[in-house]
Amino acid sequence: MKTYNVAIVGASGAVGQELIKGLENSFFPIKKFVPLASTRSAGKKIKAFNKDYEILETTHEVFEREKIDIAFFSAGGSVSEEFATSASKTALVVDNTSFFRLNKDVPLVVPEINAKEIFNAPLNIIANPNCSTIQMTQILNPLHLHFKIKSVIVSTYQAVSGAGNKGIESLKNELKTALECLEKDPTIDLNQVLQAGAFAYPIAFNAIAHIDTFKENGYTKEELKMLHETHKIMGVDFPISATCVRVPVLRSHSESLSIAFEKEFDLKEVYEVLKNAPSVAVCDDPSHNLYPTPLKASHTDSVFIGRLRKDLFDKKTLHGFCVADQLRVGAATNALKIALHYIKNA
């Protein structure tokens, strides 16, 4: 079997760490592993495959010098903008950032939906979709193929690790401060003691309806990503309206979905379609308190769906609640599936 030299740009970040775990736990045919990062992190040690690796600086030359075959980019859009094209001259690039997602020459891939697009990459770059988009499309696509979707309204409840290690540290530090203050004075106004860290407001004991920047139409970039990326991945144009909220959860994004179909539907058929959908786990027995939660979804590679029910007033509308580990399903696992599909079918 052919083996590959693999690089991860942003190896020390939250998604980079999940990529390493995924490579360690999969049957990925690795010949050489090269961790890459910024000048700030270069020279530091990182553990992978039961040994220590020195992080190299990301440069335009490093990919050719190290004979990289596959390069995963998870270090932010500006890094992908600067270095991905250089890497793609000698390596297949799988980019986890938003920079290339809507580029017409770069396929945007969820392998369970449009794996064939992996081989339609003239720039030798394949984009990994937004984490919230990946889990949503894995629910929408099988339903659309069976019932035909008319429109979607989605509200997200997104974990702090979606903002990387700085988001995790903000929640931990703010919770520590808040709990210490509440121990001294249970009636204290936390607005007076908590300071914003990685987010626009303190995230501890809070919910912030603000992910990415606001656009002139009142939507955030995150909300518009879910619209435009879904259209590109699924090849559809039905309306999608999103509201994205950051919540004080460490890991796994949740989404409340309201899906309007073109015709009335049978709820039993919905269950059958989703039970047979790849990477989807139906978790739905409210009488026994069985429904998706972020804790249950964390450290898994499934999109959990539950609370499935017909709208009380519109027989064509389905409601549901889906949860997935955004660091795995929404980033690392999807990227690895792209690379593995490429290797097996090239």
Curated annotation (Swiss-Prot):
Signal peptide positions on this chain: none
SMART domains cross-referenced by the UniProt entry: Semialdhyde_dh
Enzyme class: oxidoreductase
Keywords: Amino-acid biosynthesis, Diaminopimelate biosynthesis, Lysine biosynthesis, Methionine biosynthesis, NADP, Oxidoreductase, Threonine biosynthesis
Record GO biological process: 'de novo' L-methionine biosynthetic process; diaminopimelate biosynthetic process; isoleucine biosynthetic process; lysine biosynthetic process via diaminopimelate; threonine biosynthetic process
Active site positions: 131, 253
Residue positions binding substrate: 158, 246
Functional note: Catalyzes the NADPH-dependent formation of L-aspartate-semialdehyde (L-ASA) by the reductive dephosphorylation of L-aspartyl-4-phosphate.
Name used for this protein in its record: Aspartate-semialdehyde dehydrogenase
